[in-house]
Amino acid sequence: MIVHKVTDQFPLFLPESKTPRSPGVHMSGIIRCIATETGILKPEWAEEISLTDVRTITDPTAILRINIGLAWEQHYIGTLLEPYGVADHPSEVEIDGIFGSPDAESVSVIFTLSGRVVKHVCHEIKATYKSTKTVGDLTSQWMWLTQLKSYCKALGTRFAVLHILFLCGDYTYPIKPVREVYEIEFTQAEVNDCWNLLRDYRDQKQVEA
């Protein structure tokens, strides 16, 4: 048997976004900027940051990590969520001149004695090397929650579902992946306060520029 390592013959790259991205300021860009400035996002994970979220990522580890997340997202939504009525990347959203691209959306109809209530739900899919113990009840995950609240603001809803693939579970041996799904109902005040933070940060940076 003759074996040759030929990894370099098949270089990784980042595919185009499934949803066309409009030029301008994006929610993800603002969130990454705030997280980097406040120390929530460690410098080694920050890559290139910009309000427009137009990044030139060249680090092989970052490219591989992003590809893992994209592969899981594509399989998970298309194979496992669509049968439940979840739409894959339906469209880009915009509010106050800031753009965003939710992973998926669904609509639930709840029938009550007084009539029916239509509930619009934002879905976000993550693949992470974080431990289930670290993530816990999500309260420590500022970037994820801020992303969900900003999408909720643009979609006019307070409801979200976060689907997380913990690639290494809780890191207890033997290492095994764990999937957890969190249903979240924000208050309108939480959604509004989050959006005010992002919008005000954008406005401040544009004045400084």
What are these regions (language model features)?
Residues 135-141, 157-209:
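Metal-dependent nuclease catalytic regions and adjoining charged, substrate-binding loops involved
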Residues 1-122, 129, 135, 142:
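Metal-dependent nuclease catalytic cores that hydrolyze phosphodiester bonds in DNA/RNA
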Residues 107, 153-155, 197:
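Short alpha-helical scaffold segments that flank and stabilize functional sites
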Residues 126-129, 166-167:
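A short beta-strand motif that forms part of the nucleic acid-binding face
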